[in-house]
Amino acid sequence: MSSASSDSNTGSLTIAGSGIASVRHMTLETLAHVQEADIVFYVVADPVTEAYIKKNARGPCKDLEVLFDKDKVRYDTYVQMAETMLNAVREGQKVLGIFYGHPGVFVSPSRRALSIARKEGYQAKMLPGISSEDYMFADLEFDPAVHGCCAYEATQLLLREVSLDTAMSNIIWQVGGVGVSKIDFENSKVKLLVDRLEKDFGPDHHVVHYIGAVLPQSATVQDVLKISDLRKEEIVAQFNSCSTLYVPPLTHANKFSGNMVKQLFGQDVTEVSSALCPTPKWAAGSHLGDVVEYGPREKAAVDALVEHTVPADYRVLGGSLAFQQFMIDLALRPAIQANYKENPRALVDATKGLTTVEQAALLLRQPGAVFGVMKLRASEVANEQGHPVAPASLDHVAFTAPSPASLDHVAFSAPNPASLDHVAFIAPTPASLDHVAFSAPTPASLDHVSFGTPTSASLDHVAFEAPVPASLDHVAFAAPVPASLDHVAFAAPTPASLDHVAFAAPTPASLDHVAFAVPVPASLDHIAFSVPTPASLDHVAFAVPVPDHVAGIPCM
């Protein structure tokens, strides 16, 4: 037992599940952690998974099952498993613990280790895995949402004397280990569970004894039995630590409230119940969740299929191949996730093939920005690669206080939306913003670019490429103007409507030029620098002809 100062806690703990069906159930996320962990501890259900872990791990792998002993209470073993993982975390290692199935379902050491690690100041998290319940849903093909579903551990069910709801599905785990506290499972107390089931469902109700197949050579067990059959020794002998019982609802208990159906749907109870809650049918060897194949409602739905058209708001996959691969790698690789969290700018800059819009979306680090790039309406897809175009109706880009701290540029790639009329940053403008760039053609309706107080400290340029919008009438920087700003540039032709460029106190010390290309706008009436005028300003350049009404450069 140990604790450490959070200042020096470089270790971490990740708990993951390997699933039930050998390697087939291991998620890509878990595999990525296996490949990047410093050390892997595991308790798995088969040797193939063990071999796969060892093949893919970069560091040592240790089997926690060695801590089990026939004469040891399981709880003590679980405490020791947790402590073994924690000791490696305390040594500063990136630790991965893998448990078969889902690591949070009937896994005591995983929860204990996570709780203690967090209390000691270490990073700790759990990754999901495929549980035997998930496996059961697929093999038995019943939907837990149709009738509702309750799940119990067999011993806990008996200890708590819980009343089983006969109107819904019930799942009972570990029926082969009723009342067992050590590693050796024996099933002498199954009869107590049978007594309980007969009390609630009667002796003739059908249940399913289920064991999901593990190895490719294994066969799934899904034996349909009467509850009274569970008293037979030859049946009970087939139960083991992996045995689960599925208890379907009683048919007669599956009824809707006619009054509530009317209130919710305004329809007859018979019509609604057939659509939302079909009666379960039971027969040995058949699938357990039979459906209404082609009743009147189903036939009408099938007939309507040929007339279906793609909805206007349906979105297709978009984004460049580079953006798609970036997001796939980000989802799968823990190391990339950490780098993205620490320094998104560096990671984005190092990724080739991203458009400026995609770069901006990644730097915002918001789910909405990613969906905006990757899920597009047909009208937004510009080419076969799915590169998006800016919507024609966009009239402004606005960042409210506080603007995202990591934003370093706002970039519009060709074509920019024709209706864009302003780009506005409300206080505080992000400290990392270094440029606002419009590529050809800049929107014709753009009339101002404004930065609220304080303007970003790192901003070094505002650039408009040809043609600059004819409607632009001002570029305004509120106090304080960023110290790193070194130029404001307008490419030919400079907008005819521009009437001022204004810098509020203090003007940036690094500003070295304000440049206007031919022709200089006829409407320009002033360039204003507030006190103090920047010491580094080396020119204000006007190409021929200069507007007659521009008398000079006022210095305030």
Curated annotation (Swiss-Prot):
Keywords: Methylation, Methyltransferase, Repeat, S-adenosyl-L-methionine, Transferase
Residues binding S-adenosyl-L-methionine, per UniProt: Y100, H102, V105, Q174, G212, S243, T244
Biological process according to GO: methylation
InterPro entries xrefs: 4pyrrol_Mease (IPR000878), 4pyrrol_Methylase_sf (IPR035996), 4pyrrole_Mease_sub1 (IPR014777)
Prosegment residue ranges: 543-556
PTM comment, free text: PgiMA1 automethylates at Asp-421, Asp-434, Asp-447, Asp-460, Asp-473, Asp-486, Asp-499, Asp-512, Asp-525 and Asp-538 before being processed, probably by the M64 family peptidase found in the genes surrounding PgiMA1, to release methylated peptides which then undergos macrocyclization with the N-terminus of the modified core peptides. Peptide backbone alpha-N-methylations change the physicochemical properties of amide bonds to provide structural constraints and other favorable characteristics including biological membrane permeability to peptides.
Role of this protein: Fusion protein of the methyltransferase pgiM1 and 12 type II borosin core peptides; part of the gene cluster that mediates the biosynthesis of a type II borosin, a highly methylated cyclic peptide with potent biological activities. Type II borosins derive from the C-terminus of the fusion protein, and it is the same protein that methylates its own C-terminus using S-adenosyl methionine (SAM). The C-terminus is subsequently cleaved off and macrocyclized by a prolyloligopeptidase to give the final product.
Subunit structure: Homodimer.
Designated name of the protein: Methyltransferase/ribosomally synthesized type II borosin cyclic peptide precursor pgiMA1
Originating gene: pgiMA1
